[in-house]
Amino acid sequence: MLKIIENLSEKTAEQLYDFFSEKPSGLYVLFALLDWTGVDGAWLQSIDSDVTALVVQREQSKVYVTARENADFYELGDFITRLGGMVIHCPADITERIGMTAFSKISLMCIEKEIESPRKSVEINDNLRPVFDLLTQSKQKILTQNPNVKLREVKKYTDRAYNEWLARTSRGIFNGYTSVRAIKQGVNAILSVAVADRLKSSVYIRDVATDNDFRRMGYATDCISGLCSDFKTQGEMAFLACNDLKTENFYKNLGFETKEYMDLGIIEI
């Protein structure tokens, strides 16, 4: 039976950790629950006294699902259908079992090999605007190149997006589960950044970026390997999600291995 999780807090994901931490897909869904202020609803499925599945509905019509082998998959599919018009993220091995049609795939990759780290990163807790600008560098460039988009509209868009990103990131830093690390040159120049969330002994690297000019010089590998290596020291398991083959192969060269695939799709009525 599925029941709503009442009184969500930053402790909710931690309380469910032991049930869903065996596989990267379970952790991926738990990290979707970690930023609980952006969650529109969360439900647990249990059979007798055994917790079998977790459903998390987030902003922008996204649903994250993880389930154990003894879950009631028919109930899961029927329930998600009733949520209506959602893009579903679920482990590839349960896609058909909940009646979902997949249209895309992401790979969950874990650090398995020792990463050589010629560049050391530093942790950043304040003045995060340069971090955000680097993470969104390519998107802002696309906007500014569009002749139909005025510069003031780009600034308005990026300022609003920054405030939303800052709210989530600073909240995570304040609550002790988010770390922002950077490769710096000199005092102010940031060459590469990464943002990761931490839940017990697991670390989810959710955002990585390297300055465009610096990347063209061929230093992205050195920077990102340093960032990932430093995050690995914060937990027993460090993983990230890739949504294309080129990125997946890039991280394989850094010492990551693909452990599991998540399907993105919909349940057609």
Protein language model features and the residues they cover:
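A conserved beta-strand-loop-helix scaffold within acyl/acetyltransferase catalytic domains
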Residues: 57-58, 145-209
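Conserved acetyl-CoA-binding loop-helix of GNAT-fold acetyltransferases
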Residues: 71-79, 210, 216-230, 253
